[in-house]
């Protein structure tokens, strides 16, 4: 029996909270700006 992979969920994660999705909306850009200010190495997923 084959094991279940996480390919689908990681794709969904990118589509929901990826960098390009964040840059689309005003609030998403605010999230990126805040994370840059805090010095996060990972701005988005």
Curated annotation (Swiss-Prot):
Disulfide bonds: none annotated. The keyword Thylakoid does not apply. Residues 10-27 have a biased composition (Basic residues). It holds the Pfam family Ribosomal_L34. GO terms for molecular function: structural constituent of ribosome. GO terms for cellular component: ribonucleoprotein complex; ribosome. Keywords: Ribonucleoprotein, Ribosomal protein. The keyword Ribosomal protein applies. Residues 1-27 are annotated as: Disordered. Belongs to the bacterial ribosomal protein bL34 family. NCBIfam families: rpmH_bact. This is Large ribosomal subunit protein bL34. The gene is rpmH.
